[in-house]
A protein has these predicted regions:
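Acidic, Ser/Thr/Pro-rich intrinsically disordered cytosolic tails and loops
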Residues: 1-192
Length: 192
């Protein structure tokens, strides 16, 4: 007799918790979309890559927003940074320590540390992180990660903007130059 009210209470609590999580996720997404980054971040990107015009610098800033969306979706899982240009913007944002800490707390619910690949716990951490970035990027752009028909923004931007020290990815690994990372392997290797 007492189990029915307890079961109903548990169901109600679960539904309320799920509604809270959904509302929190939507609030964080709106914050990431509307956040005004310090103007000097875009200036730093432009100084680092002087061949970029204003629209291309803004594309890098959009990439930074996109990266934060991926981190928000990933929760506490590590997401590797697929773009060198966007990484420059992220580094510059980190220098605004109070603003960065406040943004992370509100947009991600935690402080997002920047960990170089060399300092990761294990050699496979970066691989897991790039697979997470690939999967979430594809999902955000409406593609199945194992059957992407194009590169998502964060995987395409360095090549599109001709970033000399950038990361380059290719969907078709057989047709790509030898310097490209094979995105096909990221999307469909075992362990994805």
């Amino acid at each position: 007799d007492n189990l029915i009210p307890l079961a109903l209470a548990a169901i109600v609590l679960f539904v309320l918790y799920m509604a809270y999580r959904k509302a929190r996720q939507a609030r964080r997404e709106r914050l990431i979309d509307s956040y005004r980054f310090p103007e000097s971040i875009a200036a730093k990107v432009g100084k680092t890559y002087p061949h970029l015009n204003d629209a291309e610098v803004m594309r890098v800033m959009q990439g930074l927003r996109e990266y934060f969306h991926l981190c928000n979706m990933a929760g506490r899982r590590m997401v590797s940074m697929p773009s060198q240009a966007v990484d420059v913007a992220w580094h510059e944002f980190i220098l605004f320590t109070r603003k960065y800490e406040h943004f992370c707390g509100k947009a991600l619910g935690r402080f997002l540390h920047h960990t170089p690949a060399e300092a990761m716990r294990s050699p496979t951490s970066a691989q897991v992180g790039i697979k997470t970035a690939w999967r979430l990027s594809c999902l955000r752009e409406g593609m199945q990660p194992r059957a992407a028909h194009r590169l998502p923004l964060l995987f395409a931007i360095d090549a599109q903007l001709n970033i000399a020290d950038g990361f380059r990815y290719a969907l078709d690994c057989k047709r790509s130059p030898g310097d490209d990372y094979c995105a096909g392997h990221i999307g469909c290797s075992s362990g994805c």
